[in-house]
């Protein structure tokens, strides 16, 4: 796959003339600090915090993209903007050429904290999403979709269980099924495996790889894990530290699919990619720590 980079834009592409599915244009996000009553009396203005700045990115259809960077660099802020859950201070995003500024069924979101309705069963959590997006759909068709995605994520037999009866891995599988059941154009995943133990995390990574092979949705994954990004991604977006975090570099991951984690380090270029990511994260993290010491 080709990687085109210039000052204005970073384009992830295998064919340069193919239209991007997701486009981010000059995205910045500024948060206003709180102003105390004393500051108001003294007529002090609140301080601004620039979380991300000057983000330009285009992603082609059916592409798995991971975003990685030091803690606090605005990865989740960027994902929330793509999801329509937060508005950029400058710039805009578009999907298939249409500017979007709110959540929509074209983007399914999987959260780290699961975000399941505790009073609903597994099937009801998924069905609620389908009913919300497709209110006029026949009941039988809704139920068929729910069962299809329960099967896809390997939860047959758990349809009537409530979230408190599920392990963390099972809850996350419900979240993935719920996001996919509305048939989005892309899946947005905010550190979905961060709270899981190593064995469960590895199992779900393999499940996501399998599901991606079957569904071929575009995926944007936020992660702290170099190995996870290399296992799952077609491209890896590396961000600088905040404030005013930017895209530092985009790495193309040329490994064949389907991938086997036990063979990952044998792929040509694996060690070079891993070393580049380790060097970037080490440099950015060290700079963050040094800036904290100086304060």
What do the predicted segments below correspond to?
Residues 68-70:
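The feature captures the beta-strand-to-loop junction immediately N-terminal to the Walker
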Residues 138-158, 210:
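Conserved ABC ATPase "signature" region
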Residues 91-103:
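Conserved ABC transporter NBD signature motif
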Residues 120-129:
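Short coil-to-helix segment of the ABC ATPase nucleotide-binding domain corresponding to the Q-loop/switch region
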Residues 162-166, 170:
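Conserved ABC ATPase signature
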Residues 83:
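Helix-to-loop junction immediately C-terminal to a conserved catalytic motif
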Residues 181-185:
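A short, proline-enriched helix->beta-strand linker immediately N-terminal to the Walker B motif
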């Amino acid at each position: 796959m080709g990687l085109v980079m210039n000052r204005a834009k970073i384009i992830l592409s295998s064919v340069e003339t193919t239209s991007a599915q997701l486009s981010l244009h000059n995205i910045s996000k500024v948060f206003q600090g709180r102003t105390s009553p004393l500051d108001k009396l003294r007529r002090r203005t609140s301080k601004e915090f620039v979380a991300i700045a000057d983000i330009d990115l285009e992603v082609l259809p059916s592409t798995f993209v991971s975003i990685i960077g030091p803690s606090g660099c605005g990865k989740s802020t960027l994902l929330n903007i793509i999801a329509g859950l937060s508005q950029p201070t400058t710039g805009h995003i578009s999907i298939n050429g249409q500017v979007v500024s709110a959540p929509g069924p074209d983007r399914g979101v999987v959260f780290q904290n699961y975000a399941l309705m505790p009073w609903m069963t597994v099937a009801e959590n998924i069905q609620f999403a389908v009913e919300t997006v497709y209110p006029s759909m026949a009941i039988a068709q809704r139920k068929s979709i729910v069962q299809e995605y329960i099967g896809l994520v390997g939860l047959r037999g758990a349809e009537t269980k409530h979230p408190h009866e599920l392990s963390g891995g099972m809850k996350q599988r419900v979240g993935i099924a719920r996001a996919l059941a509305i048939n989005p154009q892309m899946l947005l995943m905010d550190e979905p495996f961060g709270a899981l133990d190593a064995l469960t995390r590895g199992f779900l990574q393999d499940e996501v790889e399998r599901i991606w092979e079957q569904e071929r949705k575009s995926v944007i994954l936020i992660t702290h894990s170099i190995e996870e990004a290399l296992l799952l991604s077609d491209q890896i977006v590396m961000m600088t530290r905040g404030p005013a975090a930017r895209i530092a570099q985009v790495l193309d991951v040329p490994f064949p699919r389907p991938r086997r984690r036990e063979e990952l380090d044998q792929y040509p270029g694996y060690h070079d990619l891993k070393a580049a990511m380790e060097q970037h994260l080490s440099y950015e993290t060290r700079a963050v720590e040094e800036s904290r010491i100086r304060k």
